[in-house]
Design a protein with these regions (language model features):
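Juxtamembrane/disordered regions of integral membrane proteins
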Residues: 1-124
Length: 124
């Protein structure tokens, strides 16, 4: 399978699984974002696509390509989300530590779950 097709499959899997988390956490995120920017969430879909391309490439390059264990996927996801969350907390006084912790853990779960699904159903 070509690398670009693999990354596209990874990206779609990540986005699909992440949708359920973001949807279930929408009230928390809506409140947080509105408190910080003074208006409701407004999505930039192009930026979102770029984000999932980067995440898909990272998961492929550092975990799936080398057939690393699920723990490596979990740690990579946690590190990526921890960097984002702690940077947000650094710049935004009202950024919640609750979101920092929840979203950091979710990053690990998302990457491990995506790796599991891809190996189980797509032979990665």
């Amino acid at each position: 399978m070509f690398v670009i097709i693999k990354i596209l499959i990874i990206m779609l899997t990540l986005a699909s699984l992440d949708f359920f988390y973001l949807y279930s956490m929408r009230t928390i995120f809506d409140k947080q974002i509105t408190e910080i920017q003074g208006s409701p969430i407004s999505l930039d879909f192009f930026a979102g696509i770029l984000c999932y391309i980067a995440l898909g490439f990272g998961l492929y390059y550092f975990v799936l390509r080398e057939k690393k264990p699920l723990l490596d996927a979990f740690l990579l996801g946690m590190i990526i989300n921890a960097v984002y969350e702690t940077t947000s907390k650094t710049f935004f006084k009202k950024w919640s530590y609750k979101i920092v912790v929840l979203d950091t853990l979710w990053g690990g779960i998302l990457f491990a779950l995506t790796t599991f699904v891809l190996r189980k159903f797509f032979a990665f």
